[in-house]
Every structure is written in structure tokens, then in C-alpha cells.
From Swiss-Prot:
Pfam families for this protein: Aminotran_3
UniProt enzyme class: isomerase
High-level lineage: Bacteria, Pseudomonadati, Pseudomonadota, Betaproteobacteria, Burkholderiales
Keyword annotations of the record: Chlorophyll biosynthesis, Cytoplasm, Isomerase, Porphyrin biosynthesis, Pyridoxal phosphate
Name the UniProt record assigns to this protein: Glutamate-1-semialdehyde 2,1-aminomutase
Organism annotation: Methylibium petroleiphilum (strain ATCC BAA-1232 / LMG 22953 / PM1)
Length: 436
């Protein structure tokens, strides 16, 4: 690929952009090789700088639930752009989007719009601390909540240890109040609350951890987490940047509410789908908590581009489309057909593979033994066969299927993916496995 336009663009990019990319996973460091520079997209497809077409299962890391260039979204964005790109003042459209989000999320009474998932998670964390008057927070190893300093933490040794920074440039003092636990571990959770319950402001969790590829929080674990937060006066914060309006119309929290009577988080963080591909995110919760935010309360949060009129037009059009009858049933069926086909192809080739899906989100792993179950936490994800995944990724890429270039990232199906696209993907999988 040395003489390709992708390669020359990457070489050029590395001279002016650190690592040649503006977000690390795009550099293909995890899988090796040359990243694809995308020239255009339409429906379920991407075209790279060399003109090669790919069936897209990244979907801009989740936002493109309708596919690329959906007519209703294009029309809304084009109209909004002619009216003005940014005002730094309130608009009717941001009120409409807030109302639409609240209609779909029963746990929330108010919502604040921001520009990125990192900003939303950081703001929700500050709000939780301000509302409770406490400092300590709990997160889980393998869950990603953006790159705010307090959340860039990995676990130390033991069941419940205060975190150590994952990134250089984050002082240890910044994360001394961050407690890192093992996902799906009830024993560790109970130990943490037993030792620190009166000091914990909030627990932040990805209900389906899409930054461990695809790992669900089990029902007993989630039920106990809700009980402990209530018992100790800590807020339960659902990070639904990835799962919100993606795995179900009401997000992952609606799935837990069906299985656990009365279940709801105290605060929710959204992004990706609510922006439809534009920079937009939000955090939401009960009025009594949300009104702790400035200008009403003492918790400060602000943003020049928050509620941007073009982004809100894109998000509003997207949310209205996904509410149409049968949308999620069709999306979930296509995702299930894809995952079942991938698993069947692997079984037929004698290759161990496990996977899971919900709504339009899926993930799969290559365990090192045929008897392995789905991973339940970060350590178990790390124990899967990364080298086999890398070979599979490149085999699929060569055959025109664009999967996430990292073992730890979920995949996404859109409404634009057709049965023919899925069958073409499965044919590529069979050929890739046969060539391995």
C-alpha cells in the first residue's frame, strides 16, 4: 500500500498532526497497517482516498444510526445552515431537542446540551459532586467516559483501590478521589461501599461497555448497584453516550427498567446518536438535581457552542426518524442476522468466536479456547486472542468491510444496511476465515 493515496496522506498528516490523526484509534496502532482516509460516505458505505468502497460498521463510532446522508437529516442541516451557523444565544430548536430527549427518557426531567461526550461526562461528574457535597467517585475498569482528567484512571491492585492515572499529564492528586472497581463484580462493589459509602458522590458506568467491545452489566450486578447507591445516597450516573437511542429508543436504561422494577439512573449522559453525526451531547436528570447548575445553582457549566443550531437540527431530525414505527425492530433484526452469521461462519471454520448484540450495536471476541464464555470484565476481554482479531480485521478490510480497528471497540449497524450488505459481509467473513 506504499504507493496508495491513503499512505501518502498518512505520511503528510504525520508532519502536521501528532500521530497523523485527531483521535488515537484512527491511527490503526492497535491493528497495524495504514489508516484509511475517507473521501466520502453514502448510506451504509464509505469510500477511501484510493476510491475503494467499504461496508461501514463503525458509523462514526455510533452516531450514524440512519446511515450516511439520510435525506431528512440533510434537508434539516442544509436549512439550518442557511439560517446561521452559531449565535451564542438560545434558539427554539434547542428547546425542541431537549423536549424530544425528555419524552424518550423517563428518568430525566431536564437536560443540558453540550458539544461532546467528554464534556457531558465531565459536567455530570461535577454536578454529582456539587449536588451531594461529596468528592469520591466510582468507575469501572474498561469503561471509558471521555478524557477528562478525573476519569482517565486505571485500577490498582486489590478489589477496591484508588486510581492511578492512565495518561501522562494527569497528576496523581487529581485522581485520588476516583475509585476503580471490576465490572460485574458484586463483591468488590459491596466492599467499596462498605469502606467509603458516605464519601461517594456518584458511580459512573457504561451499562453496556462499548469500550470493552461489547460487555453487558448483568442484571444482579446492576440491581445491587442501584440498591447500594440509594442506600448510601450516591448518584447512579449512566453513561449512555454509546447506548443512548442506539440499543433501544429509551437507551439501555429502558432495558434495565423492564427487568428491574422501578429501576432508573439518577443522571444520564448522552451523545453520538443525539447529534446524528454533528458535535452534540447532553446530560440529564431530575429537576432537583439539574437546577443545581448555573445560572440557577452553584455548579458552573458553560459552552460557547452548546446547543449549536446546525447540530441541534441534525440531532432533532435523527431522533424523529428513529421514532418511526418498526424502526428499532428492523434495526435489531439486521444486527442479529449479522452477528449470528459471523458466529456461524466462525464455527464452520473451526474458529472459536463469541459475541452479543442489542439494537444496532454488536461485538465479538476470539477466545483462546472453544469453551470460553462471553467476557464479563476488562481482564477477561484482555485474555481474548488479539492477534487473531487483528488478522480478521485486515482480512475483512481487504474484502471491503470496515470494522472498528481495535479489539476493544463495538460495531454498529445502521438502518441503511440491507440484507445484501449483510450477506456480502458474511461472504467476506467466510473468505477471511478460510484464508487464515
Amino acid at each position: 500500500m506504499a504507493d496508495s493515496r491513503n499512505a501518502s496522506l498518512f505520511e503528510r498528516a504525520r508532519r502536521s498532526i501528532p500521530g497523523g490523526v485527531n483521535s488515537p484509534v484512527r491511527a490503526f496502532r492497535a491493528v497495524g497497517g495504514t489508516p484509511r482516509f475517507i473521501a466520502r460516505a453514502d448510506g451504509a458505505y464509505l469510500w477511501d482516498a484510493d476510491g475503494k468502497r467499504y461496508i461501514d460498521y463503525i458509523g462514526s463510532w455510533g452516531p450514524m444510526i440512519l446511515g450516511h446522508g439520510h435525506p431528512a437529516v440533510l434537508e434539516a442541516v442544509q436549512k439550518a445552515a442557511t439560517e446561521g451557523f452559531s449565535f451564542g444565544a438560545p434558539t427554539e430548536r434547542e428547546v425542541e431537542l431537549a423536549e424530544e430527549i425528555l419524552k424518550l427518557v423517563p428518568s430525566a426531567e431536564q437536560v443540558r446540551l453540550v458539544s461532546s461526550g467528554t464534556e457531558a461526562a465531565m459536567s455530570a461528574l461535577r454536578l454529582a459532586r456539587g449536588a451531594t457535597g461529596r468528592s469520591k467517585i466510582v468507575k469501572f475498569e474498561g469503561c471509558y467516559h471521555g478524557h477528562a482528567d478525573a476519569l482517565l484512571v486505571k485500577a490498582g491492585s486489590g478489589l477496591a483501590t484508588f486510581g492511578h492515572p492512565t495518561s501522562a499529564g494527569v497528576p496523581t492528586e487529581v485522581v485520588q478521589h476516583t475509585l476503580v472497581l471490576t465490572y460485574n463484580d458484586v463483591t468488590g462493589l459491596e466492599a467499596a461501599f462498605s469502606a467509603h459509602g458516605a464519601e461517594i458522590a456518584c458511580v459512573m458506568i457504561e451499562p453496556i461497555a462499548g469500550n470493552m467491545n461489547f460487555v453487558r452489566a448483568g442484571l444482579p450486578f446492576m440491581k445491587r448497584l442501584r440498591e447500594l447507591c440509594t442506600q448510601h445516597g450516591a448518584l447512579l450516573v449512566f453513561d449512555e453516550v454509546m447506548t443512548g437511542f442506539r440499543v433501544a429508543l429509551g437507551g439501555a436504561q429502558s432495558l434495565y427498567a423492564k427487568a428491574i422494577p422501578g429501576f432508573k439512573p439518577d443522571l444520564s449522559v448522552f451523545g453520538k446518536v443525539i447529534g446524528g453525526g454533528m458535535p452534540l451531547a447532553a446530560f440529564a436528570g431530575p429537576r432537583a438535581i439539574m437546577e443545581q447548575l448555573a445560572p440557577l445553582g452553584p455548579v458552573y457549566q458553560a459552552g460557547t457552542l452548546s446547543g449549536n443550531p446546525v447540530a441541534t437540527a441534525c440531532g432533532l431530525a435523527t431522533l424523529r426518524e428513529i421514532q418511526k414505527p418498526g424502526f428499532f425492530e428492523s434495526l435489531a433484526a439486521g444486527t442479529r442476522d449479522l452477528l449470528d452469521g459471523l458466529l456461524h461462519a466462525a464455527t464452520a471454520a473451526g474458529v472459536p468466536m463469541v459475541g452479543d448484540c442489542e439494537g444496532g450495536m454488536f461485538g465479538f471476541f476470539f477466545p483462546k479456547t472453544a469453551q470460553a464464555a462471553l467476557p464479563q470484565n476488562y481482564v477477561e476481554v484482555m485474555a481474548t486472542d488479539g492477534e487473531r482479531f487483528n488478522r480478521y480485521f485486515h482480512g475483512m478490510l481487504d474484502r471491503g468491510v470496515y470494522l472498528a480497528p481495535a479489539l476493544y471497540e463495538a460495531g454498529f449497524v445502521s438502518a441503511a444496511h440491507t440484507p445484501a450488505d449483510i450477506e456480502a459481509t458474511l461472504a467476506a467473513a467466510r473468505a477471511t476465515l478460510a484464508a487464515a
